[in-house]
Amino acid sequence: MSYPVSAQPQGVQGYMSSNSSQWNSDVFDCCEDMGTCLCGTFVPCILACKVSKDYGECCCLPCLFGSVLAVRTGIRERYHIEGSICNDWVCLSFCAPCTLCQMARELKARN
């Protein structure tokens, strides 16, 4: 005997994560990894390419406008790091080399 369905299961709205984490280092902790710090200071374009490659994307991706912001947001999403795209934009706008160093340290620590 079959019974009619009286209530449909409800979907979940949005993304909720109870296991969110923080960045392993702050934006201005550049001296934690001196090699990354020097690279970010003197050749940030090379560091951006390395971060993109370590993230799993093409190393030429940073040549596209806005792609470093997308990679930073992707790192946050992949590792469930708290924050927002607005926060990512502010960090990259006001101290891009330090932010690139933070991204490189995060990928190094997580991989």
UniProtKB/Swiss-Prot annotation:
InterPro entries named in the record: PLAC_motif_containing (IPR006461)
Pfam families in the cross-refs: PLAC8
Coiled-coil segments on the chain, per record: none
Protein family membership: Belongs to the cornifelin family.
Protein name: Cornifelin homolog B
Protein source organism: Xenopus laevis
Gene of this entry: cnfn-b
